[in-house]
Structure formats: C-alpha cells, structure tokens
Design a protein with these regions (language model features):
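Terminal accessory carbohydrate-recognition/targeting modules of carbohydrate-active enzymes
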Residues: 1-211, 244, 252, 507, ...
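Specific register positions within alpha-helical solenoid repeats of the TPR/Sel1-like families, i.e.
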Residues: 259-263, 307-314, 387, 394, ...
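Aromatic- and histidine-enriched alpha-helix N-cap/loop-to-helix transition segments
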Residues: 214, 245-256, 264, 296-307, ...
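The feature captures the catalytic groove of carbohydrate-active enzymes
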Residues: 161-171, 175, 179-181, 283, ...
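Short, ordered beta-strand-loop transition motifs
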Residues: 85-90, 154, 163-164, 343-346, ...
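Alpha-helical support elements that line or immediately flank enzyme active sites
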Residues: 248-279, 441-453, 498-511, 518
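Extended glycan-interaction surfaces of carbohydrate-active proteins
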Residues: 209-247, 272-292, 344-373, 412-493, ...
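Extended, well-ordered alpha-helical scaffold segments
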Residues: 191-194, 211-218, 265-278, 319-341, ...
Length: 575
C-alpha cells in the first residue's frame, strides 16, 4: 500500500478524530462557536468541550501553526513541536519537544457543571471529572514533569495541568468510573504507523475500484473520523452527521452514508441503514434523530428508505442474506404502514407532513403557506417504498398484492390530485389550498424515474434544469424572490436532494442532465469541502463544514461517474 500521508486538512474545517471514538480535537466547541485554542471535545451526552489545549513557551501562550493529517495532529513553531495521535478510540497520546502545553479545565465547578481535578493515589495519574459528559478524563504522565494547579479545589478556581518545554509525553483518556492504569503498549511512532495504515485501508475500501483523488481521500477522512463505536442509544457502529455540533444520526441522513459504505463494507452499510430502525416505535415511526444519550420523536423524516435499500443492494460488496432481507422487510413494512395508517386524513388517499421538519427540508418555501400538507415528494417516496416491499415479499415468499394495490392507489392520487398539467403542487390537508411550487422539493417525484408518464418527466427535468447552477441544483431558484443565499432549504445546494434528483433523472432517461448535476456537485465539493450545504451562486461552503452525508454523496457520485466513464471507454474500444 502506497504511503499517501500527505493529505493536509484544516482544523477549522474538520476535527481530528478516529474511527470508533466519541472524542475529537477541534476549535469548534458548540453550535457555531469557534475557540482560538484547540479543545478536547466529547460527544457523549452531547457536544462538550472538556479541556482547552494551549501551547506554552517561556511561561506564556505560544502561537503555533496547526498541521492536521488523517493520522496525526501537530502544533508547530520555529522547529519546536507538539504531536497528537490516537491510541484506540478512547485515548490520545501527546508529546512535545521545545513547546509545553497547558490542559485547562473550566474555572467554575458547581453541583451540576464543571470539572473536579485530583491526583489518583492508585497510579499517580491526574483525573478530571466532568458533570457535562458524565465521564472522567485521565492524564497519565509518561515522560517529563508537569505542574498541577487546582487539584482538589472546589467552587471557583483555576484548574490545569501544564507540561514544560523539555521533552514530555502524556496519555489522555476518557473513562467511566474506573479503569486499569494506562499502559503504553506501543511507542508513539508505532501508534502513528498504525493510524496511518488504518486510515489508508479504510479509504481504499471506501473508494473501491474508483480512481483516487484528493476529494475521495478527504471524503473518506470525514466519514472515518465521524464514525463512533456502539455506546448509549447508538447500538451499532454509526457515522454521525458530524463531530462538530451536528453530532447525531438523523433518520434520512444515514441512508446516504450507507450507500457510500456499501461497496467496501456491506456489514457497516447495513448497520448504518438499520440504526434508526432500532428505535422504531409501536406505530412503526422512526425517530427524528438518534445520538448517544437522546432519541427524539417530535418529528419524523421522509420515507426514502425503500429507494435507499434498492440502491444499497445494487452497490453492496456482498448479497444480503435471507435473514437480513427479512429484517429489512419487517422494518420497512412497519415504517410504511405508519404513513398509510397514521398520516392520512380520513377519506384522503395521500399522506401528509405535519411540518417541514418531517420532509427533511425544514424551512423550504413549499411550507410557507401551510405546514400540514400533502406533498408530492412524500407520495413519490412511498410509491418507491411500496415497490421495494412488493419485491422483497416475492423474494421471501410473502404476499405482495396488498403492497402493489397500495402503490397503484398512491400513484393515481399523486398524478390525479397534485399534478396541475405542468408542475406538482403540495396542498393543505384541511383546506386543499395549494402551496408554493417554486421549491425544488416539488420536483422530487423525479425519483420515480421510468415510472413517470413521459410528459411529466420532461416537465420535471425542465424544472430541475432551471434550478441548476454552476455548483448544483439550488433548493430555491436563484431568481426567486424567496431565495436566500444562506437560507438553509431556501436556496443552498444540498447533498441529499442532489443524489435523489440525479438518480431519478438517470432512470427517467435524462442522462445528459443527470451528468451535469453530478459534475456540478462533485466540483463544489472539490472546491469547498464537505459542508452541510453550499451557496448556490458562489459555491462557498455553509454551516457545519465536516458533514458526512455530503462526503458520502460525493463518493457515491464519484464512483458512479468513474464506472460510466469506464463503460464508455469499453464501448468505444469494442467498436
């Protein structure tokens, strides 16, 4: 395996972390909050900055350049350096030569907030307990001397541990109540080599047969570093949306990361797909989101899971077993019945959203007039999901007739009630009043692809072309009076809408337009990184800058584009 460790990353854009860890080193310490110093941040029980890590020289703070690679992080100044590397998911090793470092805890300790610092007589390590995370943070000095301030202090007071500029090395761990004393079973150099090898192997699996680019390796790092081990309510290995403030798994975001994982690791992909289903309630509904210490049911997310599982099977590195298919069938069936039984008004054929959050497009202009609406995207997703359920039923020896009957009824209602002749509209459930049709949301029935009447598909393709900018499909036309450059779903370009639209266009036969959508989105990712969303005019990254569904979508589109290029070259060669 070639050494490709020259991938330089920006600590202000992505955190330093590793697969399986709930920890990271970052300057991002909260919702849109950036600190000057790097902090140790945990995502157990929420996002909590635990320790401020400040380089020191001659008794004063030292301004340093931060150099970040997938396997190491360093603070550098005039030949002096501090380095950090992960030693497993719950520990970091840090060492310095020519620079010291202060590990500082919050100054305030109350009965409910802050940290308590003490020296543990068992092994001589220093321990900080955190009310915010409910965990302990143990610093074990492996080399050099440290100064400790504020040990056993309660109330208000300084609390820090500081290593001097002479060579030093410290292990920093996140613990529960107790653990065996830290034992350095590998040298620092061995840990660096192990982390480098682990990341490169992961990136190679994720990339599969596709050509490697700086974009694919950076996307791989975003996914790798945001992956956490099972803990709390997260019962499977999971890719969080980010190890910045979006540190959850939302019940549609996960689908796009599952697709990215599928070619290299079908087991991880299936776990990612099924994770929200572990918290499916008695009605069949999925939670809005899941994270370490919280499962939210106040909203749901759109039922794209039939579409996603169809794509997942097509991309997976191995066939799914009959038992796995049966599990997916059972979960998808309950999820679909929720929409048909609990989200249709009496006498109505079409299901409804209760709020924009249910659609995933929280504040899209479709919801400006009314919030409780029968929306065309919802019906289209359920039509696909019913198709997938019928196919799974046939493969498993179950009856499929009811699924097909429900599918046909929804398809008739979608075209008969929400298609105006040149566009889809949403409508209020109670009044029947039509909602705005300028949002890209209303064009999402293109996911039905070849199932759409040709004249409907052509109009949707034309609408999508009108949303397309140099960087991808804007969620609101840039010439709309409701367009907002940083308006969340009122203008910016997003990964999920792009992937869904690209897939539908291709299946509907609009290959050239699908190619343009794919190329534009890949271009904006290569230019601006894997942001939560992008300014549709400038291409600048917006909001959370290390968003995994963006990285996952890029990898999916990149792999598909390379596969098409290869197929075209083979076709030319055969002529």
């Amino acid at each position: 395996m070639a050494d490709r460790s020259d991938l330089a990353l920006d600590i202000d854009e992505v955190p330093f972390s590793t697969r399986g860890s709930w920890l990271d080193l970052s300057r991002i310490v909260g919702l849109h909050r950036r600190a000057d110093d790097v902090h140790l941040v945990t995502h157990r029980t929420g996002m909590h900055p635990i320790l401020r890590l400040t380089p020191r020289l001659d008794g004063a703070d030292a301004e340093c350049r931060v150099a970040l690679r997938p396997h190491t992080m360093a603070w550098e100044r005039d030949g002096a350096v501090i380095e950090a590397v992960f030693d497993g998911p719950d520990a970091l090793r840090l060492r310095g030569d020519g620079l010291g470092m202060r590990f500082a805890a919050p100054a305030e300790l109350t009965p409910f907030t802050g940290g308590y610092l003490f020296r543990d007589p068992l092994d001589g390590a220093f321990v900080l307990t955190s009310y915010e995370s409910g965990r302990r943070y143990r610093l074990t000095v492996l080399r050099g001397d440290v100064e400790v301030v504020g040990a056993e202090v309660t109330g208000s007071g300084k609390r820090h541990i500081e290593a001097g500029s002479a060579p030093w090395e410290i292990a920093l761990e996140e613990l529960g109540t107790a653990a065996a004393p830290y034992a350095a079973t590998a040298t620092f150099e061995e840990l660096v080599a192990r982390q480098r090898s682990a990341f490169e192997a992961y990136a190679d699996r994720l990339r599969g047969a596709a050509e490697e680019t700086p974009g694919t390796r950076k996307a791989a790092y975003v996914l790798w570093s945001a992956t956490v081990a099972p803990s709390g309510f997260v019962g499977r290995e999971a890719v969080l949306m980010s190890k910045h403030w979006m540190d959850k798994v939302w019940s549609w975001d996960h689908c796009f990361n599952a697709l990215a994982l599928a070619p290299g690791d079908a087991d991880a992909a299936l776990d990612q797909f099924l994770l929200p289903f572990d918290h499916q309630d008695a009605s069949g509904a999925l939670p809005d989101s899941v994270t370490h210490s919280e499962v939210l049911y106040n909203f749901v997310k759109p039922p794209i899971h039939g579409w996603a599982f169809r794509e997942l099977e097509a991309r997976a590195s191995r066939p799914f077993t009959p038992a796995e298919l049966a599990t997916v069938y059972e979960r998808l069936a309950a999820w679909t019945r929720f929409w048909l039984d609990s989200r249709r008004a009496p006498g109505h054929a079409l299901p409804y959203y209760q709020h924009g959050n249910d659609s995933g497009w929280d504040n899209a202009t479709t919801f400006d007039t009314d919030r409780v609406i029968e929306s065309p995207d919802l019906a289209a997703f359920l039509i696909l999901q019913l198709d997938v359920l019928a196919g799974l039923a046939d493969r498993l020896g179950e009856a499929s007739g009811d699924w097909m009957e429900a599918r046909d009824g929804l398809a008739r209602a979608l075209l008969g009630e929400l298609w105006t002749g040149d566009r889809f509209v949403a409508r209020a459930v109670d009044s029947g009043r039509p909602s705005s049709s300028t949002s890209l949301l209303n064009a999402l029935p293109i996911v039905l692809g070849e199932q759409l009447p040709p004249e409907v598909a052509e109009r949707l393709a034309a609408t999508i072309a009108g949303h397309l900018t140099e960087w991808g499909p804007a969620t609101e036309p840039v010439d709309s009076p409701r367009y907002e450059p940083d308006g969340y779903w009122r203008g910016p370009i997003w990964a999920p809408s792009t992937v869904l639209i690209e897939s539908g266009l291709r299946r509907a036969g609009f290959e050239e337009l699908a190619d343009r959508v794919s190329a534009a989105f890949r271009r904006v990712c290569e230019r601006s990184g894997f942001a939560e969303n992008f300014d549709a005019v400038t291409g600048d990254g917006l909001r959370d800058r290390a968003y995994t569904w963006t990285a996952g979508a890029y990898l999916v589109l990149h792999a598909d584009a390379r596969e098409r290029d290869t197929a075209r070259l083979l076709t030319i060669g055969e002529r």
